[in-house]
């Protein structure tokens, strides 16, 4: 009778094990410490140099700068090292201490890696032309010279919030900023005096 019985091996149910999936965080080239976006360096520099800057903005800029190590060439061309060095003498201990950390780390790295350049990311000439025009419009609305630090800071903050692109949101935001500065004298004075932070001003007009 056994020859008519097909025997199959018994399959034992093994306990199900929940496998923990590894979560990988994708790294972008800009997240690397030695990859330096020149535009970001210049934007943070204007934040550090703008008079009556808030402690929060200074700390935020220094924390971003701490994530990067510019090459000797970038330090020389942007003078960001000088800006950080000046902040070391800030009256607030936290700001001064953070600036000292950034400055010391950069100096130590440059001295130990003189022959290792960083990767620099620049804007193209067409983009720079559009931005110069935006700065011109902002300077006229603010009644300041085009090379004034406040004009540069507003434009760079706008460019940053628009993903560093000359796109429709950038153009519309610039127009909104210029219109407000021209026709709202009280806001213009608040921006010029520093009572209305540049970041807040630009963010509220972002299109």
UniProtKB/Swiss-Prot annotation:
Keywords: Acetylation, Nucleus
Pfam families: Med26 (PF08711)
Subcellular location per the Swiss-Prot or TrEMBL entry: Nucleus
Upper classification of the organism: Eukaryota, Metazoa, Chordata, Craniata, Vertebrata
Chain positions with N-acetylmethionine modification: 1
Alphabetized PANTHER family for the sequence: TRANSCRIPTION ELONGATION FACTOR A N-TERMINAL AND CENTRAL DOMAIN-CONTAINING PROTEIN 2, TRANSCRIPTION FACTOR S-II ZINC FINGER DOMAIN-CONTAINING PROTEIN
Protein name: Transcription elongation factor A N-terminal and central domain-containing protein 2
The keyword Nucleus is annotated on this UniProt entry: yes
Gene Ontology CC annotation, any one: nucleus
